[in-house]
Amino acid sequence: MNPILRDILDLLDVERIEENLYRGRNAAESEHVFGGQVLAQAIASAYRTIGDARDLHSIHAYFLRPGDWNAPILYQVDRIRDGKSFTTRRIAAIQHGRAIFSMSSSWQKHEVGLEHSVPMPDVPGPESLRSDKEAYVELAKIRPEVKRFAYRFDAIDSRQVENILMMAPSNVARPPQKHTWLKTRDPLPDDPEVHLCMLAYMSDLDFMSTSLLPHGRSPGGDRNNFQGASLDHALWFHRPFRADEWLLFAKSSPSASGARGFVRGQFFNERGELIATAAQECLIRVRE
């Protein structure tokens, strides 16, 4: 396994402090706390109180305050309910005595029922597309600051169908949709917790920027007059999946108003099955 992927997996793991209390750390090479990391660490903390007897089917999270990358994050798990079919956990992420993040999660016992799935978008497969790693290496030659984002693509093979990079300057209005193929660069352990956490991590990669496409803006092109941040994040897990196999992340933004953008995305496996759905509201504040 390549060292960057190993580091990310270690980062997404949490340390048990005592019953219902866990500790996560931050990446030394990143000068911000990535939302996908906090999502994954919160899921890992809840998972430790449940195990693999139940399937995670949904999370609903709020980002309350910016995180401090120089301090560990404590995760307090509240065991709201342990029912016959469903289990509920509420998780608070705490730094310096204040909550920076809260999440509710629901878990279901294994059941079989009715099935259907919307069709996967008709887009080129990943084999014909350029890796984001290659594109970011070139961009970093003129924008060294993007290296703090690019290191993730040493671990995650990400390929854009429309070839739109989040950190690349843009002044061209585009339709509010993007399609990205994603998977880890190396095989992962079979542990379901690892795949849940990795998908949560990947679901926050280049998601918010979809809401900027119709306005000819990008986080990379508006560094001095644009403020962006995730406000909330939701995930629904529909079917079993592996994060080390190709997944298509089909993203769209149906609305932006009131300095907030709304984005949603669907994850499909290569067989065309819908395996997860994501949604997020984000701050997209333009400074005049």
What positions do the PLM features span?
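Terminal targeting signals and extreme-terminal segments of soluble enzymes
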Residues: 1-288
